[in-house]
């Protein structure tokens, strides 16, 4: 006797009368000799059901098994028994208790089969994955990524009236539910927030606390396994991992297209549709479309991959967005994000390469506490170079333009995401040594009103995705103008990640460098500091730049410490409160109606930063054309440490505007009211100026002039004369363009 199952109910179905009669409850069921199902009450046999190859056994429901038997081959009458077990586990155990029953169990896969997610994922990997995202601290880490969270909110709210207002939205992998809240802010009627980890409980708590229980419905489960009570109009998610594809969440995001209303599903190639239908099961089908595969109209079934004879998806893609040339085709459903670009570029980083080799050199020791480690040195090198490096870097280490791999989430199939082959072709712009390939991605939210992009590029503010670099096992020296070809092949694995193969080839030679990497095992190298530019990036003396910046900062500090009492307006003292209005209207009086400056006839005031003052009676268009480029906005020289200009440059007179101050990288000119401060300790000297550094000041105009404080470094002279950074009080009330 095999394992026994208790508390079983036995019924017999009468096919002639279409009735079901109960034979007993609280029974014990066991399989004897693999051919007889014995049903007993205590020690009394209630029924023995003989099974053979002529019998049919079905899992009738979650807890019920139907056993159909007949006496001989020619007998057309089946006797059907229904066994009601105490739990689904008892049903599985019973059906697997005999080799004779196992194939019968597998005939009906409706309840015993696994989902698409389970078939492609190791159970231990799924447990770790969902446990990781169930932690509040991890959700906080993502939510505090300002670039990520704010870009999603901007994309959703910027398309609120056209894409979200009055719509039903599906949030795939909702996590804390932050994207669902954004959809509600945009006017969505209802949001289904699907979350497979235990974070679903916390998400529901936030929904209840924010009094949105009727509008945000939290569903605990995998997107591949759940059903929805209605189709949706919009799908939102944050499915990107390191190097875009890690964690294989993109496949779940694409799978969610089956929940879109039928008229919103994007068509794909017919050949893909046929291939997918061969393996199509209930998990793949839309829960709103009746299965018609057994009828003569089976080709009319609407799945998330529709027949489309003349459409070539590759021809539709332009700048990351899909444009349908045939207006009769269904409009694509809104998916945020809609498209993604993966950027791949070679890089040169001798320090990183040496760092990885340095780690492996630990295993060169022949006497580590008396133990010889050298046998593992080669294995250590292989392991360290198989790790993708997650950090950030200066774009200057890349000697070529990146290659771009585009994906459209509205049309791509799940199978296309399981194997990715990306050809590479570069034209080298700088002689360098290539140590590997760098990866980052941008995703686009293509809305009806506005397109919004989220970038993880090294030239953009840092996100929690950073960038990823894959090292080559052997460096490759390339010259300017040389071509470099290769490919990146990514194969999905059951650990929710990818096995990455990179290959670089120098055309016309035998040189070929390859490496294999495990995206599941990255090395997190980011140390919290901004990346330094690569060696050799300075085009002028860093020492001179440093001391010029220091001098400018000191002079600005002296200016801020000054407490002037009066200003001079054509010889008449005025209060500081009236200073801002001194030039309005062209006669030294405020013009409250226009709110702007009539600078054509306005008197000009300039100030020496250190010890004196300079006053001129001319108008602004005739004022200084030569201004030092070391003056920035409110924070002097902020962000200018690498591009500081030490010598003056002429500027365009027509560019002079109030409220604009020049930086070394900005052609907008500092010209807000250059003014004079009467400092008691200063002794003004009145003399005509025929020309001040080519400023073009007329010779018949008098100015108050004091010597300029300057710092000389070789042939360069850094000066702060004639340019000031006005205080907030001075700028108040002045219109800025």
Swiss-Prot record:
Gene Ontology BP annotations: chromatin remodeling; methylation; regulation of DNA-templated transcription; reproductive structure development; S-adenosylmethionine metabolic process
GO molecular function (one): histone H3R2 methyltransferase activity
Source organism of the structure: Schistosoma mansoni
Protein name, entry field: Probable histone-arginine methyltransferase CARM1
Taxon lineage: Eukaryota, Metazoa, Spiralia, Lophotrochozoa, Platyhelminthes
Chemical reaction(s) catalysed: L-arginyl-[protein] + 2 S-adenosyl-L-methionine = N(omega),N(omega)-dimethyl-L-arginyl-[protein] + 2 S-adenosyl-L-homocysteine + 2 H(+)
Pfam families: PrmA (PF06325), PRMT_C (PF22528)
Active site: 238, 247
A single Gene Ontology CC term: cytoplasm
Keywords: Chromatin regulator, Cytoplasm, Methyltransferase, Nucleus, S-adenosyl-L-methionine, Transcription, Transcription regulation, Transferase
């Amino acid at each position: 006797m095999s394992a026994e199952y208790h508390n079983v109910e036995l019924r017999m179905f009468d096919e002639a009368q279409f009735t079901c009669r109960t034979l007993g409850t609280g029974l014990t069921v066991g399989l004897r000799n693999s051919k007889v199902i014995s049903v007993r009450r205590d020690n009394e046999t209630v029924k023995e059901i003989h099974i053979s190859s002529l019998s049919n056994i079905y899992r009738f429901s979650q807890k019920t098994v139907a056993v159909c038997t007949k006496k001989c081959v020619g007998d057309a009458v089946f006797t059907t028994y229904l066994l009601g077990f105490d739990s689904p586990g008892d049903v599985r155990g019973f059906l697997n208790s005999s080799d004779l029953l196992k194939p019968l169990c597998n005939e009906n896969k409706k309840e015993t089969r696994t989902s698409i997610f389970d078939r492609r994922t190791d159970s231990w990997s799924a447990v770790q994955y969902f446990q990781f995202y169930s932690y509040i601290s991890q959700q906080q880490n993502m939510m505090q990524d300002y670039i990520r969270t704010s870009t999603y909110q901007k994309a959703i709210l910027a398309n609120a009236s056209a894409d979200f207002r009055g719509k039903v939205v599906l949030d795939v992998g909702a996590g804390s539910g932050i994207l669902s809240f954004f959809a509600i802010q945009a006017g969505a009627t209802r949001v289904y927030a699907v979350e497979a980890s235990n974070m679903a409980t916390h998400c529901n708590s936030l929904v209840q606390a924010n009094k949105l229980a009727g509008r945000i419905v939290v569903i605990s489960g995998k997107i591949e396994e759940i059903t929805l009570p209605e189709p949706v109009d919009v799908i939102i998610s944050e499915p990107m991992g390191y190097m875009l594809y890690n964690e294989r969440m993109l496949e779940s995001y694409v799978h969610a297209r089956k929940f879109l209303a039928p008229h919103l599903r994007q068509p794909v190639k017919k050949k893909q549709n046929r291939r997918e239908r061969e393996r199509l099961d209930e998990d793949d089908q839309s829960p709103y479309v009746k299965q018609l595969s057994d009828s003569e109209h089976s080709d009319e079934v609407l799945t998330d991959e529709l027949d489309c004879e003349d459409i070539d998806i590759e021809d539709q893609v332009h700048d990351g967005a899909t444009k349908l040339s045939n207006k009769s085709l269904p409009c694509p459903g809104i998916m945020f994000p809609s498209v993604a670009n993966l950027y791949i570029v070679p890089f040169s980083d001798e320090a990183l390469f040496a760092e990885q080799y340095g780690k492996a050199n630990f295993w060169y020791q022949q006497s580590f506490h008396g133990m010889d480690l050298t046998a593992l040195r080669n294995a250590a090198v292989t392991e360290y170079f198989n790790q993708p490096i997650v950090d950030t870097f200066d774009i200057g280490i890349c000697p070529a333009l990146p290659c771009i791999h585009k994906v459209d989430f509205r049309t791509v199939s799940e199978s296309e995401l399981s194997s990715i082959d990306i050809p590479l072709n570069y034209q080298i712009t700088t002689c360098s040594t290539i140590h590997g390939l760098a990866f980052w991605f941008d995703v686009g939210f293509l809305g009806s009103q506005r397109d919004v992009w989220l970038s993880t590029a090294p030239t953009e503010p840092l996100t929690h995705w950073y960038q990823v670099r894959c090292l080559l096992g052997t460096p490759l020296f390339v010259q300017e103008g040389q071509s470099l070809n290769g490919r990146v092949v990514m194969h999905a694995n059951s650990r929710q990640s990818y096995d990455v193969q990179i290959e670089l080839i120098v055309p016309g030679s035998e040189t070929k460098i390859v490496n294999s990497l495990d995206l599941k095992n990255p090395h997190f190298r980011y140390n919290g500091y901004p990346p330094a530019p690569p060696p050799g990036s300075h085009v002028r003396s860093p020492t001179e730049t440093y001391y010029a910046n220091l001098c400018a900062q000191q002079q600005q500090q002296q200016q801020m410490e000054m407490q002037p009492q009066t200003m001079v307006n054509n010889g008449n003292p005025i209060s500081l409160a009236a200073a801002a209005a001194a030039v309005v209207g062209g006669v030294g009086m405020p013009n409250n109606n226009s709110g702007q400056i009539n600078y054509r006839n306005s008197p000009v005031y300039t100030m020496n930063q250190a010890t004196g003052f300079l006053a001129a009676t001319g108008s602004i268009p005739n004022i200084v054309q030569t201004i030092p480029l070391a003056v920035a906005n409110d924070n002097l020289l902020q962000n200018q440490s690498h591009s500081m200009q030490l010598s003056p440059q002429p500027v365009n007179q027509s560019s002079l505007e109030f409220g604009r101050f020049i930086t070394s990288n900005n052609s907008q000119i500092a010209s807000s009211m250059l003014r004079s401060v009467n400092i008691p300790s200063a002794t003004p000297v009145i003399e005509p100026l025929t020309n001040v550094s080519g400023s073009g000041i007329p010779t018949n105009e008098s100015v108050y002039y004091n010597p300029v404080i300057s710092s000389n470094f070789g042939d360069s002279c850094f000066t702060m004369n004639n340019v000031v950074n006005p205080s907030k009080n001075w700028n108040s009330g002045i219109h800025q363009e």
